[in-house]
């Protein structure tokens, strides 16, 4: 029987961020971890002949610096929800969950996770845009920030940054069932917590390691109780046999 290492048993750290405060904070939270210094994250993340399926069972963590910008204009086919200045941000690449249908499997050559620790530079890049116009920004498109919040603290920092900039609205999308954050973080009506939900059978079959749908719905209630606006996302829409029956298989949150 194949035995995998635990998640983040190996952490690759760019030499340029080895002394960065966020790098140190993240490493302090990891136990029994092998730390390997590298010159550039692409030396590991973009190397040839990686097995994404194998890596999904034992993800490595890569701590790096983004030097080319992280704020991108949203594509017309993506969900802007009527916002004119729609952007998305990649402060992390890849996800700790392993949904079979996820576009990230075809977007990245690796199943490992990259965290750009220089969040202050991303904020500076965004502030330059905010000086010109109001922005609607999706900050959790290429990763699930909520699911890894205990390690990075990025959700807390994004909320604090958004509260300081009245012409910024952000969406944080997740499949995590964490409820504790929303009573501990100060709410902001311009921080939308968006939960992707699926029928239980679909989630169990295809959304590996993600929280169960009812756990996500309960977390959405916790976010609402904490004062955050909440969005439920039925995405992607995938045809399934007996799909009409699946619509009624989840119990009510009130049960």
Q: Model-flagged regions — what are they?
A:
Residues 1-85:
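Flexible, acidic/Gly-rich N-terminal and inter-domain linker regions that tether
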Residues 62-85, 100-196:
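Conserved Radical SAM active-site core
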Residues 202, 209, 224-243:
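Conserved strand-turn element in the central/C-terminal portion of the radical SAM core barrel
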Residues 210-222:
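Glycine-rich S-adenosyl-L-methionine
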Residues 248-255:
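Conserved small/polar residues in nucleotide/adenosyl-binding loops
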